[in-house]
Each structure stands twice: as structure tokens, then as C-alpha cells.
Amino acid sequence: MEFMRNVPDKHYDLAIVDPPYGIGEANEKRMQSRHHSQRKYKGVDWDKFSPEIVYFNEIKRVSKNQIIWGANHFISKMPFDSPCWIFWDKDQYGDFADGELAWTSFSTALRKFRFTWHGFRKQIPENRIHPTQKPVALYDWIYKNYLPDGGKVLDTHGGSMSNLISAIKAGNIEMHVYEIDKDYFKDAKQRVELFQSQGNLFAESQKIEWMGEV
């Protein structure tokens, strides 16, 4: 939040953020994960509250367009009503939610991205390092549809850094990403560096300056 106060108006072409939803989602997924896949995450308390409205006002100020995950949990804090939501259809059943929603500032129709992200039915296996991690393929789809010409992107809650990996793959995106949790930052940095070491052309040529390194 502090860093945004020094950012000029409309500095970023797009802000894609996944802030805490304020519903205890992280700990809930920790329990579900133990039951289904034995994946354990550390106990967290940052997901008990969603950001204050001043955060969302700043996001709108510093970026030309915004995509905000989980906004259905704090809709009253959104800058304005929008017809264009993104629905990530997880193609899963049972007690789990059918998918996740993101509010956007775009004026197009609601769009759906279908990608299986549960248990043995995952379309593309990914190492899970964060309780609210999203697949890289989701961000690939977002950039293709909402930022095809590239540009500057802000992510205030980096988490697993799936967004950053997708930006590296795109090759035409300048990404500014922040993560304040030291443990998640360390794990995510290792994940990104592993991706860079695997021979992707753009990954090899794109240098990352780790501003939050501890």
C-alpha cells in the first residue's frame, strides 16, 4: 500500500490482484488439502480481512484497467459496477466451489475460462506452494485476451508468482509484483528461478530484480 502512494496516475496498463478475501479461505484450503492431497500449508491469519476501500481506490488510480480476484466477497468496495467479470470454471464437484470470480474494469461481456485444478484431474500439474495459488494457464489466458500487446502490470499480492511466470512467458510484459510474506516470497522466488532454468527462451532473456529479497 505504501509504495503505491508514490506511483503516478495510470502508470500501469493493468493491475491483476488477488488480495485476501476476508473469509478465512487460506486456512480452509489448508484443511481441504490435508484431506485430499496431504498438502500442508503454514497457518495464516492474513485472510481474515479484505483490504480497506482505500486500497482499491489506489489500485484504480495507478492503473488504466484492473482485474480483481475474489471481488464477489467485497463487492461494495469495487470502484463501479462492471458487466465484465471473469469466471474461472474449475470443473470440479462436491463441496468445493465450481470456480472463482474476478471483477474487471473492462466493458466487454462476462468471460469464462475452464481449467481443471483439483486432485488427480488437473489439466497441467503444478507444484502447489500457496493456499490460494492459481494456475499459470489462467494468467496466460488473461494476457492473451486483456493485454495482447503487452505493457506494464502490477500485482500487489504475488503469492505463488504464477502471474509473474506467465508474464515472463509472454515476453512483452513489464511486471511489478509484491509479496510481504517472507516464507511465501522465498518459495515463490525458487519456483520462478526453476522455471527460468528450464530453457524457456523469454525466461532466459528476462532479468528479474527481486526488490523484496530478504
Outline where the language-model segments fall.
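Class I S-adenosyl-L-methionine-dependent methyltransferase catalytic core
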Residues: 1-154, 160-214
